[in-house]
C-alpha cells in the first residue's frame, strides 16, 4: 500500500493500519510504546495519541488506561466503516469484497423491501419516484441506487437496516460509479425500480423476494463481466 495521506495524522493512521494489515503489528500483539512509535512514524506524541484513539473507536486497537495498547483482530472488532480501508489495502481482494457486499445487500434487501411495500407503500412510492428524473450517467445512477435502497430500508420501519446501508455508503457509491458506467446496468436498475413500483401498486408483496433475488443475480452477472477491468483507485476517496 502506498501511503497518500496529506496530513501527519492521516499518515500516522495509514501507517498503523497498513502495519496491522501486513502483520508488522499482528493481532493480539502489543503496539510499540508511544514515544518509540511517534519517532518511528515521524509525528508528535499528541498527534499519535489522537490517531490511536480514533483507531480504537474503529476497532483496530484496544486502549486501556495503565496497560499497553493491544492490536485487535479487526475482522471481529470493527464495523462496516472499515470496508473502504480494506479495499484500499489490498486491491486484489476487491472483487471478493464487493461480491460479499452485493450478496449482503441482496439478502437483507429482500427482507426490508417486502416489509416496506407491505407497511409503508406511500413512502415506497416516494422513494421510487426518484428514478423518474435521474440523469443517464454513472455518477447519477450510483447515487440514485444508494438512495433507493437506503430509502426503502428506512421505509421498512426497522432503522437498523438503514444504519447498515449508511455504513456501506462510501464503498457502495464508489463501486456504483464503475458498475453504472455500463448502460446495461443502468437499464436493469430502471427496470427493477419499475417492477418494485408495480408490485407496490398491485399489492403483490409475496413476489418481492423473488424479484429482488432475480435482480441480484442479473446485476451480479453484469458485475462479474466487468471485474477484470476494475480501476485500481476504485476505493480511493475523491479529493
Swiss-Prot record:
Name of the protein described by the UniProt record? Fatty acid metabolism regulator protein
Q: Which compartment or compartments is the protein found in? A: Cytoplasm
Q: Which residues bind DNA?
A: 34-53
List GO terms (cellular component aspect). cytoplasm
Residue ranges of every copy of the HTH gntR-type domain listed in the record: 6-74
Q: Which UniProt keywords apply?
A: Activator, Cytoplasm, DNA-binding, Fatty acid metabolism, Lipid metabolism, Repressor, Transcription, Transcription regulation
Coarse class of the primary localization is: cytoplasm
The keyword Transmembrane belongs to this UniProt entry's keyword annotation: no
- Which molecular function GO terms apply here? DNA binding; DNA-binding transcription factor activity; fatty-acyl-CoA binding
Top-rank taxon: Bacteria
Q: Which organism is it from?
A: Pectobacterium atrosepticum (strain SCRI 1043 / ATCC BAA-672)
User: PANTHER family this protein is in?
Assistant: FATTY ACID METABOLISM REGULATOR PROTEIN (PTHR43537:SF52), TRANSCRIPTIONAL REGULATOR, GNTR FAMILY (PTHR43537)
Which BP terms in the Gene Ontology apply to this protein? fatty acid metabolic process; regulation of fatty acid metabolic process
